[in-house]
Every structure is written in C-alpha cells, then in structure tokens.
Amino acid sequence: MLQAQVTKKTLTWDDVVSWKQITDKAVSDNGKWVFCKMAPWRGDATVYLYNEMGEEKASFQPAEGASFSSSSQFLVVTEKPALKVTEELKLKKTKEENMPMNKLVIYNLQANEKEVIDSIRSFKLSETADWLAYQRGSKADSALYVRALDGSKSVSFATVTDFGFAKKGNVLFYTSAGSDKQEKKETAGLFTYAPENGSTLLYEGKGVFKNVSFDEKGDKLAFLYCAEKDSAATALSLYISEKNAMARLIADRKNSAFPAGWVISENENIRFSANSGRLFFGTAPEPKQKDTTMLAENRPNVQVWNWNEGIQYTQQLNDKAKELKRTYTAVFNLKSNKIYQLATIDMPDLKVADEGNAPLALLTSSKAYEKESMWKGSLLRRRFRIYRESFRPQEA
C-alpha cells in the first residue's frame, strides 16, 4: 500500500514578515488585568486585554503601546494609523501636517467602555493618580489638556512647550511661551499644576527652559534656564524650587566650583538623589562657537593623528558626536547649599550608590591605559573613591 505523499508547505518571506511576537506586556497593580502587545516583524501590532481568568476582554489595533492607570481602573492605549494607509499617503507625497495622527483610547476596565481622543501629538500619564496630560494637533496648536481619566475634571493651558508629571505625587510641571495678545495675555514661565491647588508660577521668563526634573515625591523641582535662546549652549543657569516656592538660582557659568572656562550643560539630565538631599547635574568645557565670519570652503580642514595618541583615529571619528556631548557630573548639596565638581577630564566616569544617598561615590578613568588597550584588546581602569564630606578622591 502506497502512502500518500504530503507536500510540505514552503516557508515564504510573507510568513516571516507576518510572524508575531510579544513586544510589550504588563500586569495591573491589583493583579486582575493583563495586557500584551503582539507585533509582526512588519505590519500593525495589536494590544490584547485579559482578565485574571485568562479571558480576552478587548483588543486594540493598530496599536503602538498601552499602560494601566495607577488605580487599575483604566487601560490607556495609543492607536496609530495603519501601516498600509501611511505608506499609501507617503507615496502620494502627502505633507506631514496632513498625515493622520495617533489616537488615545481610555478604556474603563469595569464598565467595559472606551473613550477616544483624536489627533494626539504627545501625552503623559501620571504614575500615582488617574490623571492624563496631552497635546493635540500640529505643533502650532500648543494647548495642553490635563484631565482625570474618568472625565470628572479637566483644565487646559495655552502656549505650552514642555510638560511632565512627578514620579510620585499628583503634580505636573509645564512651561509656557506666553502671549502678548491683548485679547488673551498669557504669562511666560515655568508652572506647576496640582488638582487640589491649581497652577503656581515658579519662574517667570520668556527664555529657554531645559531638563526640568522633579524629585521623586514632587516636592522639589530643578531646571536649567537661559534668557536668550541663542546663548543656551553656553549660558544656562541652574535653578531649584522647594515646596512650590518661587525658584532660586543655584549656579551659573561663573560659579567658582567649576573649572575655569566650564559651563552648565544640557546634555546630562538633572536628577535628585532618592532622599532629595542632593542634586546631580552636568558641566562641560564651553563649546567652541562656529566662526560665522568665514565661508566653510575657506576654513582649513586638516586631520592629524599621532601614533602616541591613546585612541585610534578611526575610533575618534566614530566617537566624535558622543564626545562633543560629553559631560562631567557635579552635585549640589541642599543641606550645605554647596556645589562640588565630582567628575573631571582626568576622572570622567562617576557611579553613585544607593540612588545617590550613599556617602561614597566611585570615579573611574581609562586614560592611562588607552594606548595599551589598542594592542591587548581589553580596557583597564583606574578607580577612585570620593568621599562626599571632603570631596577628595582616593585611589581604590
């Protein structure tokens, strides 16, 4: 008896492209809900929602991401335009401002109801309260909308350029460019908003705000500011606000704690220690300004490398963009009201322990071993302990 020959299906490129995998997943804080995002190698992803029994309760496609609210009562999903639609519009050379935008779905887990907000440009969800902040439409529409997820309360603010929630504590910051229009004047500056207290002005100014950062509880807020946009690369100043009071200046480029010719840099994030007693920020040598008095073709373009240099020329080229943004960590002690420069050019790499609370920090440097590493392949480092009380490094 002849066995029937079975032809095996050949794996095609379409099969590979459509193969799905889990790219994101989360469990609600109360443990009763789970979502997972299933995405093909190329195509539209889907977010699936399951209850604690493993039953699928809802799905959202095409989806970009999802998050549970802190109360476990809502799932917030970002729905994006379908890939096929987007590609067809791009082939027609549709202008960016006419392309479809993302939607935000607020799904009530208990009521099995959803609310859709169209034309979302950006949004942020509070980690500790059921509050959402978002901006809609093109960049010309700078209004910020802040609302409770259940829709019980909402406010809006005009001419907003940046915003964000504190990690803990239901408080939001936003920066406003302001408006001089007679019919509706708006103050330019940095504000906080809390549902129970409303808006509070922390700093008034039409300049550039950078790297706004809360401490974990939202009681303190630090930021960089420059009154002149064109000078932001070289003239940023560091400010801090405590307990929603008007911000005060901590340091500017003239601070004696910094090496001569150094400035405060926007290329390192501002961050508080976990106990909010220290504020870490970045400094760097003042960047060289481009010579605008000479045409580019008239500038000398000579590249020189010496064999005694510790890093090969090709590696230097590869690292150039990163090195131009290199920063060196400094710290402000809120109790003593003093600033200390921790990292330096000779000891550039800093590690702190216990989320910045520990009395010790570790500085490392590979500069003495760079040339040796070219031949051996491995990179050695010198290590130094730095005591926060004396701030004098000791080799470890």
Task: Label the predicted regions.
Residues A4-A396:
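Beta-propeller folds
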